[in-house]
Amino acid sequence: MKAGIIGAMEPEVAILKEKLTDAKSTEHAGYTFHQGQLDGSDVVIVQSGIGKVAAALATAILIDRFQVDYVVNTGSAGGFDASLKVGDIVVSSEVRYHDVDLTAFGYEIGQLPANPAAFMPHDDLVAAAKKGIEQLSQTAGENIKAVTGLITTGDTFMTKEEDVAKARANFPTMAAVEMEGAAIAQACLQLKTPFVVIRSLSDIAGKESPHTFEEYLETAAVNSSQLVLNMLGQLKGKVLSAA
């Protein structure tokens, strides 16, 4: 199988790009797609840029032009689970938009017309991520906690208390918030491609400043990149089950 790996920012994909073998790059529509192998697994890596539109466009090209079999969205996120700390990991059990509201027309909060309220990752990808986390905890030399939970997406970096309070009220089980995952998931659904979103926490939403986000982004990038490598190892030589 060929994996498509998407990160929004350069630090979120830099480690994986450095480890590519048999690498070649292709420019298309303003994106650079890096093809090659990671520990013997065929991959295509792209830095999408920040936000929903950029992420959806990069995903569509990745799937349609490079024919990847599944998509892994890796990177950083703000934590909403009080039991988690910077560097801990959230694997998507579902992904939703937190900045969409068409409830006046009978839709659930976060739901777009002709789409589900929640985008569901592939079970095999979630299972591989969980096994990869076990490996990461054993090799990282620190206690990295991981949960499987709701990840929400919107074009907002949450530092305002009113934004945090609204998100908590609308999505009380939310474990993490970021700016690309649901858009990637929507593109994957449209193009019938399995996905999973994996995020390492770089800050705690509503409590930390952008300065703290930048300070801890490297930690999050290291952990999420290693998890992707572990996950690829778990999936090597396997075929995903029917969704």
Swiss-Prot record:
GO MF: adenosylhomocysteine nucleosidase activity; methylthioadenosine nucleosidase activity
Keywords: Amino-acid biosynthesis, Hydrolase, Methionine biosynthesis
Principal EC category: hydrolase
Residues the record lists as binding substrate: G78, M158, M179, E180
Matches recorded under InterPro entries: MTA_SAH_Nsdase, Nucleoside_phosphorylase_d, Nucleoside_phosphorylase_sf
Keyword Hydrolase: yes
Any single GO CC term annotated in Swiss-Prot or TrEMBL for this entry: cytosol
EC identifiers of the protein: 3.2.2.9
Domain of life: Bacteria
Signal peptide from the UniProt entry: none
Keyword NADP belongs to the record: no
Pathway(s) per entry: Amino-acid biosynthesis; L-methionine biosynthesis via salvage pathway; S-methyl-5-thio-alpha-D-ribose 1-phosphate from S-methyl-5'-thioadenosine (hydrolase route): step 1/2
Reactions catalysed, as given in the entry: S-adenosyl-L-homocysteine + H2O = S-(5-deoxy-D-ribos-5-yl)-L-homocysteine + adenine; S-methyl-5'-thioadenosine + H2O = 5-(methylsulfanyl)-D-ribose + adenine; 5'-deoxyadenosine + H2O = 5-deoxy-D-ribose + adenine
Active site residues of this protein: E12, D203
Pfam families: PNP_UDP_1 (PF01048)
GO biological process: L-methionine salvage from methylthioadenosine; L-methionine salvage from S-adenosylmethionine; nucleoside catabolic process
HAMAP family found in the cross-reference section: Salvage_MtnN (MF_01684)
Family: Belongs to the PNP/UDP phosphorylase family. MtnN subfamily.
Reported function: Catalyzes the irreversible cleavage of the glycosidic bond in both 5'-methylthioadenosine (MTA) and S-adenosylhomocysteine (SAH/AdoHcy) to adenine and the corresponding thioribose, 5'-methylthioribose and S-ribosylhomocysteine, respectively. Also cleaves 5'-deoxyadenosine, a toxic by-product of radical S-adenosylmethionine (SAM) enzymes, into 5-deoxyribose and adenine.
Protein name per the record: 5'-methylthioadenosine/S-adenosylhomocysteine nucleosidase
Organism: Colwellia psychrerythraea (strain 34H / ATCC BAA-681)
